[in-house]
Amino acid sequence: MPGESAGRKIMLQGKTVVIGVTGGIAAYKIASLVSMLKKQHANVRVIMTENATNFITPVTFESLTGTKCLVDTFDRNFEFQVEHISLAKQADIFMIAPATANVIAKVAHGLADDMLTTTFLACKKPKYIVPAMNTQMYENPITQDN
């Protein structure tokens, strides 16, 4: 519809979207999502799990967002003293995409053992989990419970 794209730009303009990228084969597709969000004038920050870096490099997301892609919880080159708390406060929306069964289980049970999960658990804004895994894994009752 005419004007629909303009409405989305206004809706996302100035909003901070934090995207957590996990170690699934669909990780490479998130570069397109980040690019689309940037075109809609959103501020995008990306956090990756260590396993995600096996599928796509942090440099890709840094090029698309113009900001540092966070991977290591203990990186000493952060902008803020407690980076995961600062980023959680900045977020208007937090999305984990693709979300592996492993990361879904971690956040469902309150485990925070990396930059992505600690930031996700600290964030008080709307959160979205976008599962991406083999159908048998997704349909497993344990995954469904999580």
Predicted regions and their residues:
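A cross-family phosphate/adenosyl-ligand binding-site feature
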Residues: 2-146
